[in-house]
Amino acid sequence: MIDKSLFELPGVRRMFPILGILAVFQFIAIAGQALFLATAITKLWQGQLFSHTIPWVLGFFACFLSREIINFGRSKALDKLAYQLATKLRGDMLDKFFRLGPVAIANLGSGSAATTVITGIDQVENYIKLILSKVLNMMIIPMLILIPVYFLDWQSGIVLTLTFPFAIIFMILLGYAAQGRAERQYKTFQYLSNHFLDSLRGISTLKYFGLSKDYSNSIYKTSEDFRKETMGALRIAMLSTFALDFFASLSVAVVALFLGLRLMSGDILLFPALAALILAPEYFLPLRDFAS
């Protein structure tokens, strides 16, 4: 789920408690949105004037605004941390290359070394920006959302509790498949980088012996192999997202069906049914956000 070596980077361990607190505040905003909106709709359904629902509508928008502020503040903090770590990693990597000398570059491949320093560090920066908050949100927010759902309607809580592990299992299985394809794709990318840079270095020699056109076909074949590996990894990633969306949509549909039938039979009031139904998609949102 998360690379444990990430915790060895400076500042990451200090960021985790902050992100955890922000996740709790985000849950409070989510729960407030659901309760305020359900209350306003219930009052309108009961025939009350819209002016009587204004405090609840304002409460809903206040929670919505709080949620956006939390997301903005978290993004800014993670952007700053990721930039600092990426800058440090790039400097450390360049220092290590200079210390080890040309032998290390030759073993790794000059093209691979160049792409690692340039694009590889950028990918690490994006990884830090995304993974820390997504992992904590997935671990904290769904579990907290279950608390009000069980208070509102325990049957909906059971449905959500039972479907969550199945989505996790499918994510793990498809994740392992995507990991294998991604590793093969990265190896092909390394080979392509080294192959292309070696070609640039020896282009004059290739022209001298009249082999430049033949060598261009070799580069094309390598790039096609890289394209196929990339598309294969993307197909598995898309399948993972589709499977997760299917489980999430199916779970919310089951909750909505049960709530609708019980509303018709008079076994549940409108307010708890609406609040539970609004919270159901929010329960799966951190998981879907992590999978994307």
Tell me the role of every PLM-derived stretch.
Residues L19-F25, S133-R184, L257-A275, L285:
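Transmembrane helices of ABC transporter permease
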Residues K76-D95, L136, L160-S204, L211, ...:
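Cytoplasmic coupling helices
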Residues M1-I30, F50-P55, R74, L78, ...:
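Membrane-integrated ABC transporters
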Residues V24-G32, L65-F72, V124-Y127, I131-M143, ...:
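Hydrophobic alpha-helical transmembrane bundles that constitute the permease/transmembrane domains
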Residues K43-W56, P148-L162, L239, A243-S292:
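Helix-loop-helix
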Residues R13-I70, Y150-Q155, D267-L270:
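Transmembrane helix-loop-helix hairpins at lipid-water interfaces of multipass membrane proteins
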Residues Q33-L37, L58, R74, L78, ...:
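Hydrophobic/aromatic residues in alpha-helical transmembrane segments
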Residues E8-R14, P102-A106, T119-I128, L132, ...:
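An intracellular "coupling" helix at the cytosolic face of ABC transporter transmembrane type-1 domains
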